[in-house]
Amino acid sequence: MKVAECTTILVGKKASLDGSTLIARSEDGGREILPESFKVILPENQPRHYKSVLTGCEVELPGEPLRYTSVPNAHGKYGVWAAAGINEENVAMTATETITTNARIQGIDPLLVGEGLGEEDFVTLTLPYIHSAREGVLRVGELLAKYGTYEMNGMAFSDKDEIWYLETIGGHHWAARRIPDDAYVVAPNRLNIDEFDFESSDFMASADLQTIIADYKLNPDFEGYNLRHIFGSATVKDTHYNNPRAWYVQHYFDANLQTTPLDQDQPFIVHADRKISVDDIMFLMASHYQNTPYDVYGDQGTVTEKKRFRPIGINRNFETHILQIRNDVPAGLAGVQWLGFGPNTFNAMVPFYTNIVDTPASFRDTGSKFNLQSIFWLNKLMSQLGDTNFKLYGELESAFEQKTVAACYRVQHQTDKQVQELQGAKLQACLTKANQEMADLTFANTVELLGKMVEEGHAHMQLKYDLLD
C-alpha cells in the first residue's frame, strides 16, 4: 500500500500578493519511488461506475462530470491517487493530508478495515462534480457518511472567493472550516483544526458531531470547542515530526511569534506580517530549516540537531502543487496549477493553465520506470546527485530555479495579455501552447543543470588521484 505524508499551505485571497486564493500541498511518499504524472480528465473519460483498487469499494457516480486536471500515480497499481486539480468551473481540490486521531474517537467511530474510501479515491469522486469550495465539503461529507474511510485525512477546496479545509474524524465523521480571507494555514500530518464554532456558517460538520462530543464527554476544555484537543493528538512524535514544520512556516511569516518547534498548540489560523506570494510558498515547500541548527545541509547544528526534525522539503516529495484561482483575469485564465515533481529543494515549479484538454508529454508520460524524457525522473536524478554535495550544487540549483520560474512568469504575462479576448477552443489552444512552452524550457533548463552538476562534480569525486607530472 502506498504511504503518503504531506504538508499543506492555504492562503486566503486578502492574504495573498495578487488577490488569488492559494491551496498547496506536497505529496510525499515512503521508501518506494512513486512516479507522478499530470493529466486532464475529460468528461468522456471519467468513470460512471468507480471501484477502488485498495478496498474494492464501489461508487455509482453522477452524470455530466466536469473536465478537471489531475496528478495521478503513473503506474496505477495502488489506484488513481489523483491528488489535486482544478475543474472547468475554476474550483480546486487537494487531497489528502494524512492526519492523526486518538483512541477516544476510535472507540466510538473506528476507522474501517479493508473497506471504504481513502486518499486513492477522493479527488476522482469529488472534483468533477462540484461548482464551489463549499460544495466540495458537502460532497465529501456525503461520501464519508455513506461509505466511510479507513484512514484519517485532511483536504482543501477553493474557488475564487473561498477556501475550506476539511478533516475526517473516525470512520464516518468530519469537520470543516472556512479559512478567513486575510489568513493563512500550514497543516502538517496531524489533526489541525483547533477552535470550532458549531453555530457559524463558516464552519460545517457531520450532523451529529456536537452530540457525540457531549454524549461521550470528549471535550477537555472548560469553554468552547477545540477539535485538535477533542479528536487529535499531542504525542512525542508530533513534537519532532509535525509541529516543527508549522513552527518554521509561521516564523517565516512573522519572526516575532512566541512559539517553539515542540509546541503542541501552534495556531491553525494565522496572519502574516506581509502579503504572501506564490514564491513564498515555493520556498517553504522546499525548506529544510535553513538558518537554524536543524538544517541537514547547514553548518549551525550538531549531527543530532540536523536530524531532529522532519523538514518540508524532503527526499520523499514526489509531486507538489499550488492551486491558484486568480481574481484579476478573465475566468478562462483564472485557474493555474503550479506543479513540480520530485524533491522540492531541487526542482522548479511550473504555472500550468488548467483551461486545457491535454498536458505536455514531458509531464504527462512519466512511466513507471526511469525515463530520461520524463521531467519526473530527471528531477529525481538531479535531486539524488545534488544531495551528495549540497554546498557544491546548491547554488547551481538556486540559479536554475530562479531562471526557470522567471521564464515561466514571462510566458504567463505574455499569454495573459495576448488571449484576453479569446474564448472556447481558441483560448484553450493558446493556453496549451503556453503550457508546452513552459514545459519545454523547464525540461531544457533541467538538462542544462544536470550537465553543469556533472562538470562541477568531476573534480570533487572521492575516486581520484591527483596528477604529479
Regions found by a protein language model. Name each.
Residues D18, G29-E32, I41-R48, E58-E60, ...:
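C-terminal/peripheral segments of proteins
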Residues V123-Y129:
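Short, well-ordered beta-strand elements within core beta-sheets of diverse protein domains
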Residues K2-E119, R139-T259:
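A contiguous strand-loop segment
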Residues Y294-L422:
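Substrate-recognition/cap regions that form aromatic- and gly/pro-loop-enriched pockets
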Residues L191-G340:
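Ordered core of a single globular domain
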Residues G136-A145, I281-M285:
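Short, well-structured alpha-helical segments that form the helix of a local strand-helix-strand
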Residues Y129-E135:
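Short, charged, surface-exposed loops that flank catalytic or proteolytic processing sites
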Residues F400-D469:
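Histidine-centered catalytic/metal-binding microenvironments
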